[in-house]
Amino acid sequence: MDAHAITCASWNMLKAQLEAGAISSLQIVRAFRNVYEEDTRSASPLGALVEFFSDAEEHARTADNLRASCAQSTKTAGANGGSVSGKPLLGLPFAVKDNISVKGKHCTCGSKLLADYRAPYDATVVARLRAAGAIPLGRTNMDEFAMGSSTEYSVYGPTRNPRDRSRTSGGSSGGSAAAVAGGQAPFALGTETGGSVRLPAAYCGLYGLKPTYGLLSRYGVVAFGSSLDQIGFFATCIDDIALALSVTSGKDLYDSTSTCPPPATGRHAVSHHLAPFSAHECSILRAAVPRELVDAPGVHPDVSAQFQRFLTWLRAQNVQVEEVTLPALQAAVPVYYLVATAEAASNLARFDGIRYGQRGDTDALLENYYRAVRTSGFGPEVQRRIIVGNYVLSRHFSGDYYRTSVRVRSRIEQECTQLLCSYHFIVCPTAATGAFPLGERIHDPLAMYCSDLFTTFVNLARLPALSVPVGTSGTGLPIGIQIIGSQWQECAVLRLAKRWEEAPHV
């Protein structure tokens, strides 16, 4: 397996080669490092990774030595001869979004304010991946404090789309998506509050999973909107996402919002060996298509065509597909931005230049000191959202805005939950268009916010959703659709996506 083949391979392909002894973890890490270094020297770099960890090769050597030691001691022949018990991800690298803590590494959230901050511990999801043998490869670019839909609001500069470097890779986890799509990492962690995993996945032609709220621990993630935030995954195949979920999901004592799925949900645990739905199982499935999203203004004809192609495929599998109405979805984007900005204003109050953030002029009065630190440290989009959030929470307007938005959010969650009692899935496009040109929306906040039209309701309703690449536009830009399930039904979502992935035309 040569270096180019390594950087095009999925986790599962690399895992098979490692267990067969055909390649080493050190070869894998070096192959990705070479792609990263070559890209940084190019005239138009992707800007996907902001740091390639210097100790990644050392961890790779340790993984190779452990595998060799176990193989020698067990003398096991056959398929499991190169596997190591309890470490299904041994020697496999992954990239980490810059707002997820990796012990001893910078965690800047793409902000000048945290330029010198190093994480004192691993995020729980990172720790669980490490415990399974995986190797953190580097930090990925992001919109500052995860506030954006294009990865242009970053102190490191924009991230470009590997399919067309004049266009966005999406946001706020655009660096993670570009790293995987651009051959700089085989797998990446992102976070999403209103679509920041699924949108970049759609724009870059990847699978992107946003799990049920609470399935993955948020411990070690720098908070944006605490009732919305969730770690998600970027991968080139369904099996990689299933493999990651199998080792990272579950209750964490460090995060009170994390939980194990209630037994009454009948949720099947996601395992590495995930089978697609059979033909018989497909015949009893029902999928709902919300008219409010399909008929939304601004949907590009290429997106509509690829979505209809996916619906045609569903019907060919004997899945019952029906159009439905979800009236509350029309309020999803404004409700999301009211809730998210209010929570952001509260969460970001800690970055005052005293305990967190860069210190300013210590001779200034406290109020002036805070103002100076935040004005110089926060970018314009973060400042805008903090101002909106404080306005929403102010004594005179909290009843008009925040409390009303919370009530409407409950209505959205209720409508989605009731619908999913009658249907197994909701399906819709991930975005109204393919990746848009860099600079097109950065000076038009409302246009940027409307990028989240198809994604925010999922976060408000705390549902699992997967962006699935289904084709390309007439100009070759990737197009994605979403498969959305009931809470805790990640396994069902992934199984339907895997049947699509394994279909002859894919």
From Swiss-Prot:
<comment type="subunit">
    <text>Heterotrimer of A, B and C subunits.</text>
</comment>
<keyword id="KW-0547">Nucleotide-binding</keyword>
<dbReference type="InterPro" id="IPR004412">
    <property type="entry name" value="GatA"/>
</dbReference>
<dbReference type="GO" id="GO:0030956">
    <property type="term" value="C:glutamyl-tRNA(Gln) amidotransferase complex"/>
</dbReference>
<comment type="function">
    <text>Allows the formation of correctly charged Gln-tRNA(Gln) through the transamidation of misacylated Glu-tRNA(Gln) in organisms which lack glutaminyl-tRNA synthetase. The reaction takes place in the presence of glutamine and ATP through an activated gamma-phospho-Glu-tRNA(Gln).</text>
</comment>
<feature type="region of interest" description="Disordered">
    <location>
        <begin position="153"/>
        <end position="177"/>
    </location>
</feature>
<dbReference type="Pfam" id="PF01425">
    <property type="entry name" value="Amidase"/>
</dbReference>
<dbReference type="GO" id="GO:0005524">
    <property type="term" value="F:ATP binding"/>
</dbReference>
<keyword id="KW-0067">ATP-binding</keyword>
<feature type="active site" description="Charge relay system">
    <location>
        <position position="172"/>
    </location>
</feature>
<comment type="similarity">
    <text>Belongs to the amidase family. GatA subfamily.</text>
</comment>
<dbReference type="InterPro" id="IPR020556">
    <property type="entry name" value="Amidase_CS"/>
</dbReference>
<dbReference type="InterPro" id="IPR000120">
    <property type="entry name" value="Amidase"/>
</dbReference>
<dbReference type="GO" id="GO:0050567">
    <property type="term" value="F:glutaminyl-tRNA synthase (glutamine-hydrolyzing) activity"/>
</dbReference>
<feature type="active site" description="Acyl-ester intermediate">
    <location>
        <position position="196"/>
    </location>
</feature>
<keyword id="KW-0436">Ligase</keyword>
<dbReference type="InterPro" id="IPR036928">
    <property type="entry name" value="AS_sf"/>
</dbReference>
<keyword id="KW-0648">Protein biosynthesis</keyword>
<dbReference type="GO" id="GO:0006412">
    <property type="term" value="P:translation"/>
</dbReference>
<protein>
    <recommendedName>
        <fullName>Glutamyl-tRNA(Gln) amidotransferase subunit A</fullName>
        <ecNumber>6.3.5.7</ecNumber>
    </recommendedName>
</protein>
<feature type="active site" description="Charge relay system">
    <location>
        <position position="97"/>
    </location>
</feature>
<dbReference type="InterPro" id="IPR023631">
    <property type="entry name" value="Amidase_dom"/>
</dbReference>
